Amino acid sequence: MAKMTTEEAFVKVLQMHGIEHAFGIIGSAFMPISDIFPDAGITFWDVAHETNGGLIADGYTRATGKMSMVVAQNGPGITGLVTPIKTAYWNHTPLLLVTPQAANKTMGQGGFQEVEQMNLFKDMVCYQEEVRDPSRICLLYTSP
């Protein structure tokens, strides 16, 4: 039996949770995952600004009742999600927010566009997790 890549495991978990639509901006950290989306039945909606992606995801989920995903890029892309994520939180809209982070060995040292994401979103989400070991990705997204 062939081993799954981290990207394949991540997309499989998205499918398990019924994610069919993702909104946002894809950068280099997310490209290997987005390459798998079409075959997995996930439509990615590229937007001009991460804030727009978050607002569209919130609206889509409220209108359809189906959870969607928001993708952002480092630094300003992440901070641009504050308004839509807080709006979704206040409206009890289930969203999955996926953001990249500085490399593990540079975290806390002012890495390129590093943002304290866990602290930034702690009052805006019901659950959050930071993945530092790619081999644990499927465990984190299948645990409550």
What are these regions (language model features)?
Residues 1-77:
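Thiamine diphosphate
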Residues 7, 81, 137:
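Aromatic/hydrophobic pocket-lining residues that form the small-molecule binding cavity
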Residues 43, 126-127:
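Conserved beta-strand segments of alpha/beta enzyme cores
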Residues 50-54, 134-139:
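A short acidic, often aromatic-flanked loop/helix-cap motif at beta-alpha or helix-coil junctions
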Residues 76-126:
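Glycine/threonine-rich beta-strand-loop-alpha-helix active-site module
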Residues 129-133:
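Short acidic-hydrophobic, aromatic-tinged amphipathic segments that line or gate anion-handling sites
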Residues 141-144:
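Conserved small/polar residues in nucleotide/adenosyl-binding loops
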